[in-house]
């Protein structure tokens, strides 16, 4: 007789998940986009390594986040609370992505920026995973997953680039 409650529970879960899929929002012209053009720098070569080369180059967490589109736990990343001046580079290919002048405290536990660095190294793609539609943030040079961008950020852009620390390498002005 235990089968009936289990079957009922599975049916309820199926209805809930199915309803969420049917009620999802389709991307519109108002889907968030970077404040600057999301194109690779002129003359910048695309970086492409084998999966094994990425595993050899990156830590396990960096690999999981950047190559497998993972997410680190909130309030655990190296840079979520860093207030130093400098530039955040892609941990995979070292191009500049975000400036500390554009970083702000969003309360989310991840580094958050309201704008991207100049150079066109940050791009976006539609992410349809986990029964929702979000805008994924990627490195235009090596296609690394960086995080997601949302439309709940501060002025002047109204955007919140929510980025995984594991996808970043911070460089102070003296290290550039």
What are these regions (language model features)?
Residues 1-58, 149-176:
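Secretory/periplasmic and organellar redox-cofactor proteins
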Residues 46, 55-61, 65-89, 95-176:
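A short Gly-Trp-Pro
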């Amino acid at each position: 007789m235990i089968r009936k409650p289990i079957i009922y529970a599975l049916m309820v879960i199926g209805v809930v998940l199915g309803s969420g899929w049917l009620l999802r929002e389709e991307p519109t012209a108002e889907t968030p986009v970077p404040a600057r053009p999301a194109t690779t720098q002129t003359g910048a070569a695309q970086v492409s390594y084998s999966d094994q080369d990425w595993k050899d180059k990156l830590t396990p967490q960096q690999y999981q986040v950047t190559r497998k589109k993972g997410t680190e736990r909130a309030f655990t990343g190296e840079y979520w609370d860093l207030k130093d001046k400098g530039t955040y580079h892609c941990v995979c290919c070292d191009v500049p992505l975000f400036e500390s002048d554009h970083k702000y405290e969003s309360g989310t536990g991840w580094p958050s920026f309201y704008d991207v660095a100049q150079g066109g190294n940050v791009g976006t793609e539609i992410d349809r995973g986990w029964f929702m539609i979000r805008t994924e943030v990627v490195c235009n040079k090596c296609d690394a997953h960086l995080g997601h961008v949302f439309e709940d950020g501060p002025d002047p852009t109204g955007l919140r680039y929510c980025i995984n620390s594991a996808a970043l390498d911070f460089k102070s002005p003296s290290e550039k």
